[in-house]
From Swiss-Prot:
Catalytic function, reaction form: Preferentially, release of N-terminal lysine
Top class in the EC scheme: hydrolase
Protein name: Lysyl aminopeptidase
Annotated positions binding Zn(2+) 2: 177, 208, 314
Named cofactor requirement(s): Zn(2+)
Temperature dependence: Optimum temperature is 100 degrees Celsius.
GO biological process: proteolysis
Cofactor details (free text): Binds 2 Zn(2+) ions per subunit.
SUPFAM superfamilies: Aminopeptidase/glucanase lid domain, Zn-dependent exopeptidases
Organism: Pyrococcus furiosus (strain ATCC 43587 / DSM 3638 / JCM 8422 / Vc1)
Amino acid sequence: MVDWELMKKIIESPGVSGYEHLGIRDLVVDILKDVADEVKIDKLGNVIAHFKGSAPKVMVAAHMDKIGLMVNHIDKDGYLRVVPIGGVLPETLIAQKIRFFTEKGERYGVVGVLPPHLRREAKDQGGKIDWDSIIVDVGASSREEAEEMGFRIGTIGEFAPNFTRLSEHRFATPYLDDRICLYAMIEAARQLGEHEADIYIVASVQEEIGLRGARVASFAIDPEVGIAMDVTFAKQPNDKGKIVPELGKGPVMDVGPNINPKLRQFADEVAKKYEIPLQVEPSPRPTGTDANVMQINREGVATAVLSIPIRYMHSQVELADARDVDNTIKLAKALLEELKPMDFTP
């Protein structure tokens, strides 16, 4: 069963892309230092935990960064304008709370919306929301007051925490991408038994702005096998039948050119051995995960993507099923324990 308290703590810890040092990095170090043989932080901010073995050398990566916001203007009335860090849709911000990390500590702001009573003209009835529409109210009445509160050009913000249990197994919260897989990776590492593989567990940085952390970590580690753990899309209303994975049916593994066929077959065999449900997702092009850069590191790496399906990705109400999380932990643990030296040449 999942550790709800630890999972929530990992999800809600601060860490927008490039600012992972605000919270999540040290939390990951504190957890892994008690179980790994060695834990270090590289110059980009990746946390790399080494579980010593012989062969093959395997790198497992789950990104710890979040999409977020940066203040780029404070007007004379104390309102903030913001720009996105990573793939933030402006419409997801309307009437929502934002958590900021200022020089004077955490502050909150709200993105206002024009009340229906004041919408008289057709142009006020809706339409496309763009970044010019996003105005953040932090409770200040002037630029000077906002600055006194600690806000500056460059202040970082993220979706406010809002972890909600919806039913016995399902829950919604901002930042399941990718904190839910980060939790699963950490939990698999904590539960790891005997293993032949030489294992590097990597909490990677800056994935949301270009897979940057995994690129440098894979160069330093030079693994033979690379497994990216990241969320994927689950069937949801109005998806027009384009999405294959479903909630509650288990973890997901891609098939496609970014995936080593022998590693994929090995994963299928392990899942069957341990009776772990495993869904398949077609990926006809390089995935948007850390496996993309791991695969083409140095002389090439045998890569796979292990995913947890979620609904409503990159919103404040990302939704997952705890049974999928639990089965992902079981499969990740089993893969690492079962991995032996083999020829991964396709």
